[in-house]
């Protein structure tokens, strides 16, 4: 990683504005999954142990620039206090006189949580005035919110231009090192597994990965567009007619580059979306006109598991089927199990793939689960992330 991190600086006695990702799911004010809070703890503890006056900032949900109590970070501040064993007050504003006074009263090793940065319309617009308001609370800026690094917002990008010292937190540093090495200097054989529902969402990542990987595996709803491009009938399965030519181009590129391009050989079909009309697996060229595929079949799972076993590095982004419904979860579960059992270094690209690994109790068997869905996807497309670019170079 060519950016400075908190390991490179002294924070003793300094006001440190740390942008974390506390965007946790809440139900009736109760945190449903605290993975993101846990992921931020090493950075928080490092800064507190170093004697920082710590100011934590995050978004939660999409309040759209209005102060809505259901999007308050109060439950997060409360949980953080329990995890750290110390007071963690919530400041009712994220900038301005109230916030400035709260920060001025901090001693070394103290921490506060600012209220949701998306309560202000200027956050998502990267308003320079709001960015300056945040910067007024800081001697040092730390970005540890990899999950929001692909967005140029006031608290993720704008603030960095108004603070002399802008560095990465430990989580951000790890994400950039793991994903960066995978893309620039991968262990081989290198396999990428791309699933999810739409080709449109994965165009950039498929295109970029075809320049790097040894094997590309396709699954999920987007695989039916590739099947159709090969001349198979896909019934009522998800199909993007306007992406058929692109699918053919990708397969041609794989051939030209000598990349093994694996696609489903069978799939699990149903007459209607749901478990009531479940039929079972059929070969990929035998989908009836009035049926749809909702998961990869057992032969495909075996094919993909073989490829995973032969790999030294595997990046997985996107499920193989509608894993939320048990009858269409076996494909995703099979791939997750193959990854868990393999010796390969496995990188799970956030979002649905991470949720699937957790659902099947296999998360702790994966080498690295990215905390950023959209951010890891854009990084794997070879794009620059605004929240990273704004940090100080080493």
Swiss-Prot record:
GO terms for biological process: gluconeogenesis; glycolytic process. GO terms for cellular component: cytosol. Monomer. It comes from Exiguobacterium sp. (strain ATCC BAA-1283 / AT1b). One of its GO terms (molecular function) is phosphoglycerate kinase activity. It catalyses: (2R)-3-phosphoglycerate + ATP = (2R)-3-phospho-glyceroyl phosphate + ADP. It is an enzyme of class 2 (transferase). It holds the Pfam family PGK. It comes from the Bacteria. ATP binds at residues 202, 293, 324, 350-353. Substrate binds at residues 21-23, 36, 59-62, 118, 151. Its EC number is 2.7.2.3. The keyword Transferase applies. This is Phosphoglycerate kinase. It is found in: Cytoplasm. Its main location: cytoplasm. The lineage of its organism: Bacteria, Bacillati, Bacillota, Bacilli, Bacillales. Coiled coil: none annotated. The keyword Coiled coil does not apply. Keywords: ATP-binding, Cytoplasm, Glycolysis, Kinase, Nucleotide-binding, Transferase. InterPro entries: Phosphoglycerate_kinase, Phosphoglycerate_kinase_CS, Phosphoglycerate_kinase_N, Phosphoglycerate_kinase_sf. Pathway: Carbohydrate degradation; glycolysis; pyruvate from D-glyceraldehyde 3-phosphate: step 2/5. Belongs to the phosphoglycerate kinase family.
């Amino acid at each position: 990683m060519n950016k400075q991190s908190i390991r490179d600086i002294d924070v003793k006695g300094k006001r440190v504005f740390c942008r974390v990702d506390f965007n946790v799911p809440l139900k009736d004010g109760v945190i449903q999954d605290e993975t993101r809070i846990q992921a931020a703890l090493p950075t928080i503890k490092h800064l507190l142990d170093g004697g920082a006056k710590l100011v934590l900032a995050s978004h939660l949900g999409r309040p759209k620039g209005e102060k809505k109590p259901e999007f308050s970070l109060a439950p997060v501040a409360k949980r953080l206090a329990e995890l750290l064993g110390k007071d963690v007050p919530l400041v009712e504003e994220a900038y301005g006189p109230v916030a400035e006074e709260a920060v001025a009263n901090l001693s070394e090793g103290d921490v506060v949580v600012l209220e949701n940065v998306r309560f202000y319309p200027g956050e998502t617009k990267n308003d320079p005035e709001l960015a300056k308001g945040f910067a007024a609370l800081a001697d040092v800026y730390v970005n540890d919110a990899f999950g929001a690094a692909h967005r140029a917002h006031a608290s993720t990008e704008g603030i960095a231009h108004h603070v002399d010292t802008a560095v990465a937190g430990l989580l951000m540093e790890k994400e950039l090192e793991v994903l960066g090495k995978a893309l620039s200097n991968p262990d081989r054989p290198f396999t990428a597994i791309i699933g999810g529902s739409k080709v449109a969402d994965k165009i950039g990542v498929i295109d970029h990965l075809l320049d790097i990987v040894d094997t590309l595996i396709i699954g999920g709803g987007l695989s039916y567009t590739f099947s159709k491009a090969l001349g198979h009938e896909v019934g009522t399965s998800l199909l993007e007619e306007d992406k058929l030519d692109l699918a053919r181009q990708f397969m041609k590129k794989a051939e030209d580059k000598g990349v093994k391009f694996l696609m489903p050989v069978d799939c699990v079909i149903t007459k209607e979306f749901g478990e009531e009309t479940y039929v079972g697996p059929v070969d990929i060229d035998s989908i009836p006109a009035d049926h749809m595929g909702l998961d990869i079949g057992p032969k495909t799972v075996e094919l993909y598991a073989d490829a995973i076993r032969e790999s030294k590095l595997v990046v997985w982004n996107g499920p193989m089927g509608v894993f939320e419904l048990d009858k269409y979860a076996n494909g995703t579960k099979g791939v997750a199990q193959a990854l868990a059992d393999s010796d390969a270094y496995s990188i799970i690209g956030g979002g649905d793939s991470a949720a699937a690994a957790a659902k099947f109790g296999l998360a702790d068997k994966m080498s690295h689960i990215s905390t950023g869905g959209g951010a890891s996807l854009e990084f794997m497309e070879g794009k620059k992330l605004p929240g990273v670019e704004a940090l100080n170079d080493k």
